[in-house]
Curated annotation (Swiss-Prot):
Organism: Bacillus cereus (strain ATCC 14579 / DSM 31 / CCUG 7414 / JCM 2152 / NBRC 15305 / NCIMB 9373 / NCTC 2599 / NRRL B-3711)
Reactions that this protein is recorded to catalyse: holo-[D-alanyl-carrier protein] + D-alanine + ATP = D-alanyl-[D-alanyl-carrier protein] + AMP + diphosphate
The name this protein goes by in its record: D-alanine--D-alanyl carrier protein ligase
Subcellular localization: Cytoplasm
Pathway: Cell wall biogenesis; lipoteichoic acid biosynthesis
Organism ancestry: Bacteria, Bacillati, Bacillota, Bacilli, Bacillales
């Protein structure tokens, strides 16, 4: 697959097809090509001998997509920076990346950045004055050159720049289109901010198939009335989101086939897909295919997938995350560095062309997490799991296991069983510390329909069900009830915010 050529094909074949929609703003494939060409021409003329990455700042504006393509056509990787990212973190990204330029789709609120800033108005001038100019195709990003760099959280407090090459992205996009049976001209949900690599799961599969990206922003998500009004207008056929976001949508009774009658495919990544969420989606969207996938940012979005059916749900209490894409392989490594046999738990290691070339400007971190196995790049994920008959089962983060009163336990396992209880719509387990040790587990629960007059009676009923599924030491000591679970801008459960709320 020639990625950029495939996207540009639609500018010639279906120039008036909408490529991207956000609120009242939209762009066609013709506009996408013309404006990204103009921008690439300007970048090449301003920085003829430079290949430093370019920061792209904004939220869900159509100009974000134009800027991404303009950067790579000029031979520069782009760094998506969402406006929700704190100023200090943006500053660190600018310093770590060595970027010299920032393209902005909206007003930049961060001051004293060590980069040249091109404002929204400046961009419009560039699109106009350089219209009709085409960049030299030889300059475009290719092969093992970086296509994008996404910054993720680092344990040291400094963000890590994950470098994803052109070849990495082509490998992912080709697999996604083929394995998920994506068709030409479909409407894709774009829920994840561009600084979160889940967004890559919809951007490039949509653009290479001549589809339309339907973007929803954080303000819509905060106002359910606006969110569902937008979804009703969208005619989305391919849904890409975290399971948490879908779970939130399922709390609205009208979120069903009647709202989105042409829904074909649900693609989930970024979190564990709870069985209960998958069951509800099958009930509400009986004609749609539900795909559960797995992969870290360092391995280009996702490397495994499985079609979740009623049979799969009946067979497994916790859903498997799928079979590995054909050009990669999975190894399960034991603590002693040997490969675990089928069915035995260990650390998930991903090998193959999806694997990043490492963290930008961080050789020590790169050496710790990445290695070479049989001449191919490999990434040590820090995730626990096992493989049975080629099927990968995810068992949470190795560092997400806690020891409570001498017992080692997986918080995600407890959450799985808690969500399966009657009267529970959503739930998160928060481990509470006393000094340096964990003291007890707190369950934060969004209750479903019930007739209990007192909270303690509801808690007793939930605990009774949990006792049938979990040993006593894994039952949360305390329960807290809320109307919703806080989420990060990326659509994942905001565990830090929850912890600060419950310990305040």
């Amino acid at each position: 697959m020639k990625l950029l050529e495939q996207i540009e094909k639609w500018a010639a074949e279906t120039p008036d097809q909408t490529a991207f929609v956000w609120r009242d703003a939209k762009i066609t494939y013709k506009q996408l090509k013309e404006d990204s060409d103009a921008l690439a021409h300007w970048i090449s003329s301003e920085y003829p001998d430079d290949r430093s990455p370019i920061m792209v700042y904004g939220h869900m504006q159509p100009e974000m997509i134009i800027n991404f393509l303009g950067c790579v056509k000029a031979g520069h990787a782009y760094i998506p920076v969402d406006l929700s990212i704190p100023a200090d973190r943006v500053q660190r990204i600018a310093e770590n990346s060595g970027a010299k330029l920032l393209l902005s789709a909206t007003a930049v609120t961060v001051t004293d950045l060590p980069v040249r800033i091109v404002s929204e108005d400046n961009l419009k001038d560039i699109f106009f004055t350089h219209k009709g100019n085409t960049p030299n195709p030889e300059h475009a990003v290719k092969g093992d050159e970086n296509f994008y760099i996404i910054y993720t959280s680092g344990s040291t407090g400094n963000p890590k720049g994950v470098q994803i090459t052109y070849n990495c992205l082509v490998s992912f996009t080709k697999w996604a289109v083929e394995d998920f049976n994506l068709q030409t001209g479909q409407v894709f949900l774009n829920q994840a901010p561009f600084s979160f690599d889940l967004s890559v799961m919809d951007i490039y599969p949509s653009l290479v198939t001549g589809g339309t990206l339907w973007a929803i922003d954080k303000d819509m998500i905060a106002r359910p009335k606006d969110l569902f009004a937008s979804l009703e207008q969208s005619d989305i056929q391919v849904w890409t989101s975290t399971p948490s976001f879908a779970e939130m949508c399922l709390m609205e009774a009208s979120f069903s086939e009647s709202m989105l009658p042409n829904m074909k495919t649900f693609l989930f990544c970024g979190e564990v897909l709870p069985n209960e969420v998958a069951r509800k989606l099958i009930e509400r969207f009986p004609k749609a295919t539900i795909m559960n996938t797995y992969g870290p940012t360092e391995a280009t979005v996702a490397v495994t997938g499985i079609h979740v059916t009623e049979e799969v749900l009946d067979q497994y209490k916790s859903l498997p995350v799928g079979y590995c894409k054909s050009d990669c392989r999975l190894l399960i490594m034991k603590e002693d560095g040997t490969i675990a046999p089928d069915g035995e738990k260990g650390e998930i290691v991903i090998v193959g062309p999806s694997v990043s070339v490492g963290y930008l400007g961080s050789p020590e971190l790169t050496e710790k997490a990445f290695t070479m196995i049989d001449g191919e790049r490999a990434y040590k994920t820090g995730d626990a799991g096992y493989v049975e008959n080629g099927l990968l089962f995810y068992n949470g983060r190795l560092d997400f296991q806690i020891k409570l009163h001498g017992y080692r336990m997986e918080l995600e396992e407890i959450e799985h069983h808690l969500r399966a209880c009657s009267y529970v719509e959503g739930a998160v387990i928060v481990p509470i510390k006393k000094g340096e040790k964990y003291d007890y587990l707190l369950a934060v629960v969004v209750p479903g329909e019930h007739s209990f007059e007192k909270e303690f009676k509801l808690t007793s009923a939930i605990k009774k069900e949990l006792n049938e599924r979990l040993p006593n030491y894994m039952i949360p000591r305390k329960f807290m009830y809320q109307s919703s679970i806080p989420m990060t801008p990326n659509g994942k459960v905001d565990r830090k915010k929850l912890l600060s709320e419950v310990t305040a």
